[in-house]
C-alpha cells in the first residue's frame, strides 16, 4: 500500500531549531508519522516536547549552539546513546539579520553564515558518518528559502547562506547517494514565524507580499509537515539533490 511508504514508525529524527515555528511544525509532523525526536535547541522546547509526547512518541532534548561545530559529534553520540541510531536529520536552525547592504556589518555576516550554512554542512557531515556506520543510509533535509532562488533586499548574509544551502544540498546528494543517503531541501515561502514578524507588522509590506502569493495567505508551520514527512520517508527514495518550494505559488508569479 502506498501509504505504508510514508510510515516512519521506529525511525529517529534529529531536528535542529524546533522550539517554535517551522521546526516545531516539522517535529510534530514527523512524530505523528511515527518518529521519535531528538531536538537540538538553545532553550528547552517545552511546547514541542508536549506536542510530540502527546502523540505517543519520545523526545530527547539537547541544548547546543549549532554554530559551534565542535559540539556536533557529541550531539549525535547522545542521540545514538538514547535511541540506538539516527535515521533522519533536519537542519532547521537559522537566523536572519536585516540591514542595508551598504551598511551591513561583518558580525551580521559571520553570525548568519556560521549558523545558516557552515553548521548545516558540518552537521550533515557528522550525521552522514553515522549513517554510513549504521549501514542503512538515511535522509537529510535542509531548510532553504525563497532567497535560495531570489535576491531579496536588506538581508545579504541570509540570501548568501540560503543560496549556499541549495548548492550544498546538490553536492552532498551527488557524493552520498552511493551510501543510500538522500539529501534534499525545503524552501519555505513567506511564513508566519518569528523571522517574518517585522514584515508582517509593516502593513504596506505585508499587503505587497500577500498580493503576490496566489494562495493569498502567509504560510503556516503545518504547511511543511507533509513535505518533511515525504522527504524523510521511503516515498522519496528516488528524489535526491532537489529543493522543494513550499510557497503558496510565490515563485510561479
Curated annotation (Swiss-Prot):
It catalyses: 2-dehydro-3-deoxy-D-gluconate + NAD(+) = 3-deoxy-D-glycero-2,5-hexodiulosonate + NADH + H(+). SUPFAM superfamilies: NAD(P)-binding Rossmann-fold domains. The active site is at 158 (proton acceptor). Its EC number is 1.1.1.127. GO terms for biological process: pectin catabolic process. GO terms for molecular function: 2-dehydro-3-deoxy-D-gluconate 5-dehydrogenase activity; 2-deoxy-D-gluconate 3-dehydrogenase activity; NAD binding. Keywords: NAD, Oxidoreductase. NAD(+) binds at residues 14-38. It is an enzyme of class 1 (oxidoreductase). InterPro entries: 2-deoxy-D-gluc_3_DH, NAD(P)-bd_dom_sf, Sc_DH/Rdtase_CS, SDR_fam. Pathway: Glycan metabolism; pectin degradation; 2-dehydro-3-deoxy-D-gluconate from pectin: step 5/5. Disulfide bonds: none annotated. Substrate binds at residue 145. Catalyzes the reduction of 2,5-diketo-3-deoxygluconate (DKII or 4,6-dihydroxy-2,5-dioxohexanoate) into 2-keto-3-deoxygluconate (KDG or 2-dehydro-3-deoxygluconate) with a concomitant oxidation of NADH. Belongs to the short-chain dehydrogenases/reductases (SDR) family. This is 2-dehydro-3-deoxy-D-gluconate 5-dehydrogenase. It comes from Dickeya dadantii (strain 3937) (Erwinia chrysanthemi (strain 3937)). The lineage of its organism: Bacteria, Pseudomonadati, Pseudomonadota, Gammaproteobacteria, Enterobacterales.
Amino acid at each position: 500500500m502506498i501509504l505504508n511508504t510514508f510510515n516512519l514508525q521506529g525511525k529517529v529524527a534529529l531536528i535542529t531549531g524546533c522550539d517554535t515555528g517551522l521546526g516545531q511544525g516539522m517535529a510534530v509532523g514527523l512524530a505523528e508519522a511515527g518518529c521519535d525526536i531528538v531536538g537540538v535547541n538553545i532553550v528547552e522546547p517545552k511546547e514541542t516536547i508536549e506536542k510530540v509526547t502527546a502523540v505517543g512518541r519520545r523526545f530527547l532534548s539537547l541544548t547546543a549552539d549549532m554554530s559551534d561545530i565542535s559540539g556536533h559529534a557529541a550531539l549525535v553520540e547522545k542521540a545514538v546513546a538514547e535511541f540506538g541510531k539516527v535515521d533522519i536529520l533536519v537542519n532547521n536552525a537559522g537566523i536572519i539579520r536585516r540591514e542595508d547592504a551598504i551598511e551591513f556589518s561583518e558580525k551580521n555576516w559571520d553570525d548568519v553564515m556560521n549558523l545558516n550554512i557552515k553548521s548545516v554542512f558540518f552537521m550533515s557531515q557528522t550525521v552522514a558518518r553515522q549513517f554510513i556506520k549504521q549501514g542503512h543510509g538515511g535522509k537529510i533535509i535542509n531548510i532553504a528559502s525563497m532567497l535560495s532562488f531570489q535576491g531579496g533586499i536588506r538581508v545579504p548574509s541570509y540570501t548568501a547562506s540560503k543560496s549556499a544551502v541549495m548548492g550544498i544540498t546538490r553536492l552532498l546528494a551527488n557524493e552520498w547517494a552511493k551510501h543510500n543517503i538522500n539529501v534534499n531541501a525545503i524552501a519555505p515561502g513567506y511564513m508566519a514565524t518569528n523571522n517574518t514578524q517585522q514584515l508582517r507588522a509593516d502593513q504596506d509590506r505585508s499587503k505587497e507580499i500577500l498580493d503576490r502569493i496566489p494562495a493569498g495567505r502567509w504560510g503556516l508551520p503545518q504547511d511543511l509537515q507533509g513535505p518533511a514527512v515525504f522527504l524523510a520517508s521511503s516515498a522519496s527514495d528516488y528524489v535526491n539533490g532537489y529543493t522543494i518550494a513550499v510557497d503558496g505559488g510565490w515563485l510561479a508569479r
